[in-house]
Amino acid sequence: MVRWSVSAELSRAVAAMGIRDPAVLRAIAEVPRDLFVPPRLRHQAGADQALPIGFGQTISQPFVVAFMTERLHLTGLERVLEVGTGSGYQTAILARLAAEVFSIEIVPELAARARAALLETLHLRNVRLRTGDGAAGWPEAAPFDRVLVTAAAPEVPPALTAQLAPGGRMVVPVGAAPGLQVLRAVDKGNDGVDLSTDLIPVRFVPLTGASG
C-alpha cells in the first residue's frame, strides 16, 4: 500500500509540473519507485529528486524521467533502446509504454540489481537486458524506433544515431559532466537526415565507455 501511495503521489507531482501525457502519468503511478531505491533511502523514494544508487550513479528525478519519457512520443508499438539501465526505474516506466525495451548497463553490479527488480520482482516480459558499453548500442537488435540515453555524453554517440530507425527519435543529455547539460531530441527523417532540438537544461552523471 505504501508503494502505490508513493507512486500515485509522484504522478500527481509531475502532472503539477507540466507532464500531460495520461499514459506517462499512469506509468509513474503504477511503478513502485521504492523498489529501485537503496533500502537506506527508501523513505525518500517519494521525493522528486535524484538519489544515489552506488558506483557513482543515481536514480533520476521523477520529473526528469517523466519528461524524457513524454518526449519520446510513445504509442505502445515501439522498440526502444535504453542506454544506462541504472536502477531499472526508467526501464520499468518504458516497459509499460512500449512494445519492447532493450536496456544496457555498463556496471555489472547495477545490472544484476536491475535484472532482479525488473525480471524477478515485476516479471516484465518485454524487457531485454545486457551488460556492456551502451554507447555502442545493440547492433544485432537494431534498428530502434526510439533511443533513450540516461547519462550525459559530450556529443550524441554516432553508433546510436546509426541504430535509430528512419522516423525515429532519440532523447539524450549532451554536454560535459559533472555540470549542466542540455537534453536534446534527435529526430531521424525518413530521408535519413537528423534534426536536433534542445529541450531543457539537465544534470546527469557522465556516460561511461567509449563515448564517455
Swiss-Prot record:
EC number: 2.1.1.77
Active-site feature positions: 60
Keyword Membrane appears in the UniProt entry: no
GO cellular component: cytoplasm
Compartments, record wording: Cytoplasm
Transmembrane regions: none
Record-linked Gene3D superfamilies: Vaccinia Virus protein VP39 (3.40.50.150)
Family statement drawn from the similarity comment of this UniProt entry: Belongs to the methyltransferase superfamily. L-isoaspartyl/D-aspartyl protein methyltransferase family.
Protein name: Protein-L-isoaspartate O-methyltransferase 1
Species the sequence originates in: Anaeromyxobacter sp. (strain Fw109-5)
The organism's taxonomic lineage, starting at the top: Bacteria, Pseudomonadati, Myxococcota, Myxococcia, Myxococcales
